[in-house]
Amino acid sequence: MQLHKNLWVVAMTALAYVGLLSFNQFIFSAFNASAASGLVFLPGGLGLVCVLLFVEWGSLGMALGALLMGMGSVYTDDPITTIGAAVLSGLAPWLTRALCVRCAEFDEDLNGLTASCLLRMTVAFAAVSALLHQLWSVARGQGGDLWGGLALHFTGQLLGALVVLYSVKLLLDHLPRLSRG
């Protein structure tokens, strides 16, 4: 039964990624430098939320969603580059979470996850994601301007994550309080 729930998390995370990336492209297409790296990249925030909540299953869902969009030529027509970028889309938030837990920012069960801790984690996530994706692009011969791409990717991940995190917070603040009895 647990495997069934975990597969459900993977599928829903992947579908949410596809939907949010499509929405992101529609809304921000006039401002983006490329389809995969924009000034505001909302799926990065989704990855952070899903990996915080569902750990490796959220990471797997992010990678699957990125792969689905990549195979639709969002990233490139090169399947190896697409697969690598998809893996990194799931790996970056998972790696950031693991680093923050290891550095005692918060516990595995999210005890101690404060607003300032979440902000530091968001900045760390944007840096890790930007660095991993830019290194992958350079390794695949598609890096172009390394520092410009790194700055753009970092900014897009950071702003996208902040938009998603604050949207989730706003939603949670306005949900009716559930009774505990």
What are these regions (language model features)?
Residues G38-L46:
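Hydrophobic alpha-helical segments embedded in the membrane of multi-pass proteins
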Residues G19, P43-G44, T155:
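Intrinsically disordered, low-complexity regions enriched in small/polar residues
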Residues F154-V163:
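Hydrophobic transmembrane alpha-helical segments of multi-pass transport and channel proteins
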Residues A33-S37, I80-G84, D145-T155:
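Non-cytosolic membrane-interface motifs at loop->transmembrane helix junctions
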Residues Q2-N32, G47-L53, W57, G61-G141, ...:
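Short helix-perturbing small/polar motifs within transmembrane alpha-helices
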Residues V40-F41, L52, F154:
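Hydrophobic transmembrane-helix microenvironments that flank and shape a buried ionizable site
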